[in-house]
């Protein structure tokens, strides 16, 4: 796209408009300034609320993918890419899943997590190539993230995923974007102009983070990665998480600390297995068999 055409396109985007509520921010005190930002941030959850039907639809597709051996893959550039990588990286310790189940890809690679990479987002072929590098397939779900809804890198990835017959989801902060025209499911969190004109790391980025939280949390809950609202598949990889695992077992079973610690030791720090052992009054092998029979869903295993 020529510079003139790009300027015209940007001028039409809500995310590039000037916010009338922040025209004088360079004249405000610190307290007045953060009040303006806070007031604008209040619009974010309301914008996300309008997209709940589309978010739920995406969750159902992600659950289907997980159940059929597929993955959830996020792709984006800049802030959008970083948020995808962040959400993906939280899944293994929180839900005990392998890191390849939820994948975050950012334009420019790992260096782009900390440093801007010139022109990384402008290449549609690079988006396709980065998906090919992780062996993206029809079984996977691709979530393309870009506040503008027009990032070439993300568009290239969405087009490639669509050509394979994979489920495609777009997350943007401008309605009827180019990405939305490609994606099977379009999540348009229209949060309005930013406090700092064009700085989509602010409200748009916050909206993206809320949506990503929902996508992974709801999907993991639906495949049995929690019991009630407890993270029973948490990986006890440090002292804080080991203490949390003990607390989870105690709360789920109403046992005392000694029972929780002893059972966790037998269960090799597997909180879900320890809970199954205590509530079903079974040994480790039997508890493992019961959980396996019910695909790791603790509540179903206990009922049956």
Curated annotation (Swiss-Prot):
Molecular-function GO terms, alphabetical: carbohydrate derivative binding; carbon-oxygen lyase activity; ether hydrolase activity
EC number: 4.2.1.126
GO biological process: 1,6-anhydro-N-acetyl-beta-muramic acid catabolic process; amino sugar catabolic process; N-acetylmuramic acid catabolic process; peptidoglycan turnover
Catalytic activity as recorded in UniProt: N-acetyl-D-muramate 6-phosphate + H2O = N-acetyl-D-glucosamine 6-phosphate + (R)-lactate
Keyword annotations from UniProtKB, A to Z: Carbohydrate metabolism, Lyase
A Pfam family per the record: GKRP_SIS_N
The protein's annotated pathway: Amino-sugar metabolism; 1,6-anhydro-N-acetylmuramate degradation; Amino-sugar metabolism; N-acetylmuramate degradation; Cell wall biogenesis; peptidoglycan recycling
Major enzyme class: lyase
Domain SIS: 62-225
Alphabetized InterPro entries for the sequence: Etherase_MurQ (IPR005488), Glucokinase_regulatory_CS (IPR005486), MURQ/GCKR (IPR040190), SIS_dom (IPR001347), SIS_dom_sf (IPR046348)
Residues the record marks as active site: 90 (proton donor), 121
Quaternary state and interactors: Homodimer.
Further remark: A lyase-type mechanism (elimination/hydration) is suggested for the cleavage of the lactyl ether bond of MurNAc 6-phosphate, with the formation of an alpha,beta-unsaturated aldehyde intermediate with (E)-stereochemistry, followed by the syn addition of water to give product.
Family under the similarity heading: Belongs to the GCKR-like family. MurNAc-6-P etherase subfamily.
Function: Specifically catalyzes the cleavage of the D-lactyl ether substituent of MurNAc 6-phosphate, producing GlcNAc 6-phosphate and D-lactate. Together with AnmK, is also required for the utilization of anhydro-N-acetylmuramic acid (anhMurNAc) either imported from the medium or derived from its own cell wall murein, and thus plays a role in cell wall recycling.
Protein name, UniProt field: N-acetylmuramic acid 6-phosphate etherase
Native source species: Actinobacillus pleuropneumoniae serotype 5b (strain L20)
Encoding gene (name): murQ
């Amino acid at each position: 796209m020529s510079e003139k055409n790009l300027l015209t396109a940007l001028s039409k985007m809500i995310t590039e408009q000037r916010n009338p509520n922040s025209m004088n921010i360079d004249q405000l005190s610190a307290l007045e300034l953060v009040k303006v930002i806070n007031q604008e941030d209040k619009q974010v959850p309301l914008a996300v609320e309008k997209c709940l039907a589309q978010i739920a639809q995406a969750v159902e597709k992600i659950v289907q993918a997980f159940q059929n051996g597929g993955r959830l893959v996020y792709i984006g550039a800049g802030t959008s890419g970083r948020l995808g990588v962040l959400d993906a990286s939280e899944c293994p310790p929180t839900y005990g899943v392998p890191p390849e189940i939820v994948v975050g890809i950012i334009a420019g690679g790992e260096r782009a997590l900390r440093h801007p990479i010139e022109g990384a987002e402008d290449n549609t072929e690079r988006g396709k190539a980065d998906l090919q590098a992780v062996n993206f397939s029809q079984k996977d779900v691709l979530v393309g993230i870009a506040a503008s809804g027009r990032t070439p890198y993300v568009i290239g990835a969405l087009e490639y995923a669509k050509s394979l017959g994979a489920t495609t989801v777009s997350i943007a902060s401008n309605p009827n974007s180019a990405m939305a025209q490609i994606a099977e499911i379009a999540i348009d969190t229209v949060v309005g102009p930013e406090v700092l004109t064009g700085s989509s790391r602010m409200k748009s980025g916050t909206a993206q983070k809320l949506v990503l939280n929902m996508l992974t949390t709801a999907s993991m809950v639906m495949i049995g990665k929690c019991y009630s609202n407890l993270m029973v598949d948490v990986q006890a990889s440090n002292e804080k998480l080991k203490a949390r695992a003990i607390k989870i077992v105690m709360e789920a079973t109403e046992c005392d600390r000694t029972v929780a610690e002893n059972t966790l030791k037998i269960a090799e720090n597997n909180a879900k297995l320890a809970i199954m052992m205590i509530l079903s009054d079974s040994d480790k092998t039997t508890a493992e068999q019961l959980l396996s029979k019910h695909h790791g869903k603790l509540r179903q295993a206990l009922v049956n």
